[in-house]
Amino acid sequence: MVLSPADKTNIKTTWDKLGGHAGEYGGEALERTFMSFPTTKTYFPHFDLSPGSAQVKAHGKKVADALTTAVAHMDDLPKALSALSDLHAYKLRVDPVNFKLLSHCLLVTLACHHPAEFTPAVHASLDKFFSTVSTVLTSKYR
């Protein structure tokens, strides 16, 4: 999926507005994913998955940090996310559908925290971006 210049502007502007909250939102989105889609918990048998868990928050920050890297390298996502793609495809063997589920929960979390900024155009741009990131992360599965 190709991101238009308007998409890139929407994504960058939105991500910049998150400021220091990206990690917090990543943890909240991950917790929301586990609660809404219980099968996603199978990849984290060693985690305390209870609400407010420090392990979930820490992993959510890793997710947010990876997305921050992706935002900074929107023009070359395959290179920027290559190591992460390898990790999820070859070591963790995460079912690709889980990226779509987490993406949905990220959109919901961002909409909850920034309703005024979450216009239809921003929603569409972020959805395209998360879909593109998911595609890159699953590209090595084939």
Curated annotation (Swiss-Prot):
GO terms for cellular component: blood microparticle; haptoglobin-hemoglobin complex; hemoglobin complex. The keyword Nucleotide-binding does not apply. Red blood cells. O2 binds at H59. Heterotetramer of two alpha chains and two beta chains. Belongs to the globin family. This is Hemoglobin subunit alpha-1. It comes from Arctocephalus galapagoensis (Galapagoes fur seal). The lineage of its organism: Eukaryota, Metazoa, Chordata, Craniata, Vertebrata.
